[in-house]
A protein has these predicted regions:
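C-terminal catalytic lobe of FAD-dependent flavoproteins
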Residues: 104, 110, 115-223
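Flavin-dependent oxidoreductases
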Residues: 1-108
Length: 224
């Protein structure tokens, strides 16, 4: 119906008047299913982390970041003291062969073909091929990862690093191969699509949620 949206999931089917899509790695595909005309592609980049051991944690009292290089689309490895008292270091940034490719060996033929059939992906690779190769080497070499971390903390040792988590960044790429660095939100009828929410979206999630709520009230004609 014109005033209803039908959402089909693996948990059943739902009818609703309004939908806010925050699809992350699937945001572009969800928008296309809703017939939204978009000019970007979501390409996944995995980031691997190490956790500092007990003897290594005392070397980090605060957040430690490198000076970002504006020529590259990624910040680089850094040290983050977590709320639980632990310290994680990373991430690197490597192209994933599966959108939800949280493991180094994850592969999906359809996802890979989808990413590599997009001209913007190849333009990104062409501009940053050396950076990309360095990132892949670091992903499979703990000594190389350590060497990069030692640029920030020279006293760090191999035994200070323990395997940590991995995350996948939903990078929104334009057709020109440039990373879309700002928020990208599209409106269509009774739906709002959050196509891109770059860093520091997680840090600012509550404030961003308030903004999207205001957008929904205006778009859908809702009252407080």
């Amino acid at each position: 119906h014109d005033d209803q949206a039908t959402i089909k999931t693996n948990k059943g089917q739902h009818e609703t008047k309004h939908v806010i899509f925050c699809g992350g790695l699937q945001s572009d595909r969800l928008a296309k299913k809703d017939n939204v005309d978009i000019d970007l592609k979501i390409v996944g980049f995995r980031g691997d982390y190490y956790d500092l051991s007990e003897q290594g944690m005392h070397k980090v009292k605060n957040l430690i970041y490198p000076v970002p290089n504006p020529a590259f689309p990624f910040l680089g490895v850094h040290f983050t003291r977590m709320v639980n008292g632990g310290v994680e270091c990373g991430p690197n940034a490597v192209f994933t062969f599966k959108r939800e490719g949280y493991k180094k060996t994850d592969f999906d033929l359809a996802d890979t073909a989808d990413a590599l059939s997009y001209g913007g992906t190849w333009k990104l690779f062409a501009k940053h091929w050396k950076f990309g190769l360095d990132e892949y080497r670091r992903a499979f070499s703990k000594p190389l990862f350590l060497k990069t971390l030692q640029k920030l903390i020279p006293s760090l040792k191999m035994e200070d690093l323990q395997p940590g988590r991995a995350g996948v960044r939903a990078m929104a790429l334009g057709q020109d191969g440039e990373m879309i660095e700002d928020f990208k939100i599209e409106f269509k009828d009774n739906c709002i699509h959050v196509l891109n929410a770059p860093s520091p979206a997680a840090t600012a999630c509550l404030a961003i949620g308030e903004d999207i709520t205001e957008m929904a009230e205006k778009q859908f004609g809702l009252k407080n």
